[in-house]
């Protein structure tokens, strides 16, 4: 039942996320979902009934879906169409590498220290990840960015396609002309 309720929480969140993402930016939504996961995992230490466990797994399903589902939007916003397949593959591989570490860790901690205790280190890991995301993901994550290309010749095709006096703006994605996000 717990996994079923996790899935139910996840699906219900996925159904309402399009409306939520129309009103709030991806950063706020995804960090809120991660905060739900962090709080839920810390609360897991105090679960003392089966019904409490079921409620917890429902809430964790919500947090998981809200924190993970918009990932595809970020990849589409951040990369040119030529690079998206590689980024989606990298995200898939990275998420599975994280699971490859987390699943055995949860099993080992549960076996050696108990299931309730295991919620605490998992909550700490989630809190650290959320804190890093909060620090490195800019609050003003604009898609159109004013920038310059000091490294390109003045007759470069990219520069000629934009009106500029040394600087120009357009939907900014990582590609061969934009190797890094501007500071």
What label would you give each PLM region?
Residues 136-183:
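Intrinsic disorder in cytosolic terminal tails and internal cytosolic loops
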Residues 1-140:
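C-terminal transmembrane bundle of multi-pass solute transporters/carriers
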């Amino acid at each position: 039942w717990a996994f079923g309720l996790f899935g139910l929480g996840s699906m219900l969140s996925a159904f309402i996320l399009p409306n939520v993402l129309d009103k709030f930016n991806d950063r706020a939504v995804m960090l809120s979902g991660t905060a739900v996961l962090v709080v839920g995992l810390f609360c897991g230490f105090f679960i003392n009934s089966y019904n409490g466990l079921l409620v917890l797994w429902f809430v964790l399903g919500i947090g998981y879906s809200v924190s993970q589902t918009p990932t595809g939007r970020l990849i589409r916003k951040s990369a040119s169409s030529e690079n998206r397949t590689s980024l989606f593959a990298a995200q898939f591989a990275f998420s599975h590498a994280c699971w490859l570490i987390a699943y055995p860790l949860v099993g080992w901690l549960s076996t050696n220290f108990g299931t309730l205790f295991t919620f605490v280190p998992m909550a700490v890991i989630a809190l650290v990840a959320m804190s890093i995301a909060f620090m490195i993901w800019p609050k003003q994550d604009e898609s159109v960015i004013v920038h310059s290309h000091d490294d390109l010749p003045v007759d470069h095709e990219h520069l000629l396609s934009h009106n500029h006096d040394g600087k120009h703006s357009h939907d900014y994605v990582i590609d061969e002309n934009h190797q890094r996000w501007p500071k």
